[in-house]
Regions:
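Glycine-rich loop(s) and the adjacent beta-strand/alpha-helix scaffold that form part
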Residues: 148-188
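Short hydrophobic core segments
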Residues: 8, 141-151
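Core beta-strand elements of the Rossmann-like FAD/NAD(P) dinucleotide-binding domain
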Residues: 3, 136-145
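Conserved beta-strand-loop-beta-strand element in the redox core of flavoprotein oxidoreductases
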Residues: 121-140
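Conserved N-terminal/central alpha/beta ligand/cofactor-binding core
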Residues: 20, 26-27, 32-119, 123, ...
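Beta1/beta-strand and adjacent pyrophosphate-binding region of the FAD-binding site
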Residues: 1-13
Length: 188
């Protein structure tokens, strides 16, 4: 089956990216190295859903849909801590695995578990295909669009994309914010 979108990494970001693509009517495949979706929230059992501390605590429809599905199983609770403007939710990681899988399946998405992306073939600056390895051996997977949702930008690194990481990025962002604040102060 040909896929329009291939998502490498089925953690929280990969599952949500897949749901977003599926809701746009795009055939979507998630390639996940572990045996379930959800990444560190499920396999790592990092169970609090931390607030974003943005004004009015904006939430996307997919976030609310996932939380509503979890709540059907009494597997999600939200609480507003004293002095906080945003809620902090807790969930059962086993149910999150099931809910993410159910939502991907319900929206006609595909997932291959226990599958590693071992290489990417880049032609004229675009990914032509990724090479995956699982019990079926090595296989090429093609798509129109590839999304890297791996924890360490593994697909980007395979393609030779320049990356910032760690303190280098934080320093760059901090300098940019400081420069913008100075500019705004002088403009007033």
């Amino acid at each position: 089956m040909a896929h329009r979108v291939v998502i490498v990494g089925g953690g929280t970001s990969g599952a949500v990216a897949a749901l977003s693509a599926l809701k746009e009517g795009l055939t979507t495949l998630i390639i996940e190295k572990n045996g379930c979706l959800g990444g560190m929230q499920t396999t790592g059992m990092v169970t609090p859903m931390m607030p974003n501390h943005m004004p009015n605590y904006p939430r996307c429809a997919l976030d609310m849909e996932i939380n509503a599905e979890l709540a059907k199983f009494s597997a999600y609770t939200e609480e507003l801590k004293q002095g906080e403007k945003a809620t902090c939710g807790s969930f059962n990681p086993i149910f999150l695995q099931a809910v993410l899988d159910q939502l991907i399946t319900k929206n006609r998405g595909s997932v291959v578990f226990h599958t590693a992306v071992v290489d990417a073939i880049v032609v004229d600056g675009r990914i032509d295909c990724v090479i995956v390895y699982n019990t079926g051996g090595l296989q090429a997977v093609r798509a129109k669009c590839f999304i890297d949702c791996t924890a360490d930008a593994e697909l980007c690194r395979m393609c030779g994309v320049g990356l910032f990481s760690g303190n280098i990025l934080l320093k760059s962002v901090a300098e940019s914010v400081e420069k913008s604040q100075r500019h705004m102060a002088h403009s007033l």
